A protein has these predicted regions:
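Conserved kinase catalytic-core helix
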Residues: 95-136, 140-141
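Ser/Thr/Pro/Gly-rich, low-complexity intrinsically disordered stalk/linker tracts of secreted
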Residues: 6-9
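Short acidic-glycine loop/turn motifs at beta-strand connectors
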Residues: 34, 75-77, 137-139
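Conserved structural core of kinase catalytic domains
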Residues: 64-109
């Protein structure tokens, strides 16, 4: 495969591609390249893909925890837009997340909120989140802004009373992130206004203890 990554020429053999391969989905295949990930769209992914113009715009926006496109990937022979690069973050299980101290966890939610505000101020609307697309290395990152789905709204949040490990992990993944209320952030048709009337991180902060873990917090609140 012959690629142009911005202005950098890169030629990869099938063996190279197999060595660098990280995984794939309905939308794309991803490969590790230095400190970046190459996201190369599948030919049949259709409307799921970002177009080159959108990817280029996002690459010029700085965010803390939303991993946006960094460089544009094109076919070196015909110039066709193939995908983009983003920062490589080594993933960890949700076990690491539920062991985070609440102070650190809430700071991460605050940074995610700031990222959404930054995108909103640049006239970029994030409609879909997929909370399975998280990367954790002591910090929490959300990957692929084109494929996110918020699982719950604050009105639907409930504290689970059965706090075994599997249920707790699912709760943290599906509900706690939803409590960041990222889904409330929408581009306004007239003025770009960030809606944080129900940013639930503030509500959690009122009941959380800085030195307890996310697991301890959930168990305490579920009593």
């Amino acid at each position: 495969m012959r690629l142009l990554i911005d202005d950098e020429f890169l030629e990869l053999t099938d063996a190279d591609m197999a060595w660098l391969y990280l995984g794939s989905g309905n939308e794309s295949k991803v490969y590790k390249y230095g400190d970046e990930v190459l996201k190369i769209y599948n030919q049949n992914c259709g409307k799921l893909r970002l177009d080159q113009e959108t990817a280029s715009k996002l690459s010029n926006i700085y965010t803390y925890r939303l991993l946006l496109p960094k460089r544009i990937i094109r076919d070196a022979d015909n110039g066709e837009f193939l995908g983009y690069t983003t920062s490589f973050i080594r993933r960890a299980s949700t076990t690491g997340i539920i062991r985070m101290k609440m102070f650190d966890f809430l700071c991460e939610l605050d940074l995610l909120r700031e990222d959404i505000k930054t995108l909103n101020s640049s006239s970029v609307e994030v409609e879909d989140f997929n909370l399975n697309n998280t990367a954790y290395d002591g910090r929490i990152y959300l990957v692929d802004p084109g494929s996110y789905v918020i699982r719950r709204t604050p009105e639907a949040i409930r504290f689970l009373r059965s706090c075994n490990s599997k249920v707790l992990n699912d709760y943290v993944k599906n509900d706690i992130f939803g409590m960041a209320k990222l889904s409330a952030v929408k581009q306004r048709s007239v003025a770009n206004m960030f809606d944080e009337y129900d940013y639930i991180g503030d509500m959690i902060r009122e009941t959380a203890k800085d030195d307890e873990s996310v697991r301890q917090y959930v168990k305490r609140m579920a009593r």
